[in-house]
């Protein structure tokens, strides 16, 4: 149940506030109501509020997100020194969907839709010179209505205007991230491969995953469009009845 207490700071004044269970390392998160509509608020924890380094990281996320508009990317609305206000998405993360509804991805059409939308939105970011650099199941929402992908959290992104990155998640980070090397489009592509590995029947994407997660960035796909081409043309791996893997062309 959402509280009816008021909450205010220099810019935002909300009709109701509910702190969410999932919190970040440096930010608290809230579901808030503004003019009768739900929004998502990310606010620096007290120990980081007022620290210019963390304020600039929030500013980078907001200024990057605010100029982008894609149906599978969460929308950014407003910024204060210590807070960001974004679209509230009624749904669950990919991690939660896999845990709560493990049968969802056993239907091929659901897997196809998820992969297509994920690739579409990452391709959109790259076309606007933005690297996400923290692609992972916890940063991908699936809406309760229509099960659409919503990519969230541009806090680690890299752009020409903001070349400094602020972190990554080791389990989905490319080798060049872990070693402090040069990042690029293949860095996000590595994470896409690791995300595909999380799907229950990921063996259908065996060839795609193998190329995405190559140790050498130059051996990976060099664009998301290349992945889309292979997925749409059916260049995947199929598990035959004897459970051996065979490379085939699958036509829908």
Question: Where are the language model's segments positioned?
Answer:
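Conserved activation segment of eukaryotic-like protein kinases, specifically the C-terminal portion
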Residues: 163-177
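ATP-binding glycine-rich loop module of kinase domains
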Residues: 17-19, 25-56, 63
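Activation segment signature within eukaryotic-like protein kinase domains
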Residues: 114-115
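Conserved short submotifs of the Hanks-type protein kinase catalytic core
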Residues: 81-93, 97
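Conserved HxN/HPN-centered segment at the entrance to the catalytic loop
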Residues: 69-79
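Terminal C-lobe "cap" of eukaryotic-type protein kinase domains
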Residues: 216-219, 225-240
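Catalytic-loop of the protein kinase fold
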Residues: 122, 126-143
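AlphaC helix of the protein kinase catalytic domain
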Residues: 94-106
